[in-house]
């Protein structure tokens, strides 16, 4: 828990316990003789170790009963101004990564609210002068995904306005509806990327494996739920006109107290 106090022996004990084949996840990708490869893995690697039960279950964080506020400082050069140099972020925990619909739905909402042309959250914050650069982040590579709205080049005293603008904008979207073209564009964009499976310079097998871990690490019976995403994309297309996305905003962004306001200010 306190890295500077970690002794060398405790470090070795931790490594022996958790960096052991019994606590590993092994997958094979490609056209191969599976029996031959598994035999090789056993003979050259796994047979050198005894199977040892390792309790490495990742537990859910207890939900907050109210939003938490965190203030931290970061260093700037002596000649830099503290004005317009604060970072503000509004963060909410969004279910778990084992919910394949939420896993993708908030990818779509991140696009529609913060990245699409005329994205309402981004526009509202910029129009209010709360920061000079607004971005969104949706991290669904962890057990409890986090949706964030981030304002750069803001000021500490704008925190209340930052929260007010976000929540007022979201309430208006729930009441009057989200831009359906933006939702469809977001779904089409993410579905195209999924079908294309173009990972640039990264090996496809590696990237597929990393996607497996988004669910496999937390439920060993569900390694492939995010690899079988076409039915989920079809479901999301059907929900565009039903109020489904507005209900998600109400439940996970407005009514949800499991979140934080983080202020990173210069010193």
Where are the language model's segments positioned?
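Short, low-order "capping/linker" segments at domain edges
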Residues: 67-77, 194-198
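Charge-rich, well-structured scaffold segments of protease-associated domains
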Residues: 1-63, 83-105, 111-267
